[in-house]
């Protein structure tokens, strides 16, 4: 088992290597372990309500849409909703479908004063495989981490 300190150092090194504006980037397994080990850590799932309902949810995650369904319009209340549900001092892990929206959400959170933000690489479903299908290459579900059907 890797210690919390080791995981956060690895995530921070990725952030430096990739020139990310937030604290770090974690694989789904690493993120799940950080969530388990870090007191008060919060996992914020920024997918849409449709994705939570039709694709699946992570039990215990805070759910705040980064973009709204249908139309994928930016959620103008994202930061206000984040402030209502997550303390600015908390370690915050951002998760989306494949790691793109969560990257934007983590960046926005840092700009809003959240100093301990991490992106979950690969997201909930991971990237598409050679046949254009998700959940076969990377992602929270593919890693066998806790989730439930919406």
Where are these regions (language model features)?
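Short, surface-exposed ligand- or partner-binding patches at beta-edge/loop junctions that are enriched
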Residues: 94-95
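Conserved G/P- and acidic residue-centered "switch" motifs that form tight phosphate/ATP-binding loops
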Residues: 45, 99
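Rhodanese-like catalytic fold shared by cysteine-dependent sulfurtransferases
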Residues: 1-41, 49-91, 102-150
């Amino acid at each position: 088992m890797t210690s919390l300190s080791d995981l956060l150092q690895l995530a921070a090194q990725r952030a430096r290597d990739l020139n990310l504006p937030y604290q770090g980037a974690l694989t789904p397994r690493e993120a799940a372990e950080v969530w388990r080990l870090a007191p008060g850590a919060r996992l914020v799932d920024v997918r849409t309500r449709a994705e939570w309902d039709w694709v699946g949810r992570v039990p215990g995650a805070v759910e705040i849409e980064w973009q709204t369904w249908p139309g994928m319009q930016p959620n103008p209340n994202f930061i206000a909703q984040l402030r209502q549900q997550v303390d600015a001092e908390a370690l915050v892990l951002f998760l989306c479908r494949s790691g793109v929206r969560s990257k934007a959400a983590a960046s926005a959170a840092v700009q809003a004063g959240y100093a301990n933000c991490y992106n979950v690489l690969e997201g909930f479903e991971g990237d598409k495989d050679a046949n254009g299908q998700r959940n076969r290459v990377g992602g929270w579900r593919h890693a066998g981490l806790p989730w439930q059907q919406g």
